[in-house]
Amino acid sequence: NTGGMGAYSPAPVVTSDVHNKVMQQVIQPVVDAMKHAGHPYTGFLYAGLMIDKAGDPYVIEFNCRFGDPETQPILMRLQSSMVDLVAQGLAGQLPSEAKWDARPALGIVVASKGYPYV
């Protein structure tokens, strides 16, 4: 399992409609289910998704950490303070939206010959 070997942000497939579907059909139901089970979640929730041609999300995996390397180009575009966002999240007071640089960002993983078998 080599995981991701590169990433770019923003992803053109993630339109406003796709974003809303992901939040309403995937993220919010998972967070609500954890809360309902008596385990409210505070932290990073990485959803590895596939988006089909109709814009419907399919979950591949969840992780309670940043995705790597997916997060690298996303953080290059973040204009809000990461420290402030984490502190606000821990206090349960996240702003509704972070501030983003509109320019695209790209991250590429460089691996030695033979990876991942070396």
Model region roles, listed by residue range:
Residues 8-10, 51-52, 76, 111:
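Short beta-strand-to-turn element immediately C-terminal to the catalytic PLP-Schiff-base lysine
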Residues 1, 47-51, 57-66:
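Short beta-strand elements
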Residues 6, 57-58, 105-108:
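Structural motif
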Residues 23-45, 63-118:
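Active-site "cap" helix and flanking loop/linker of ATP-utilizing ligase/carboxylase catalytic domains
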Residues 1-18, 69-74:
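Glycine-rich phosphate-binding loop of ATP-grasp-fold ATP-dependent ligases
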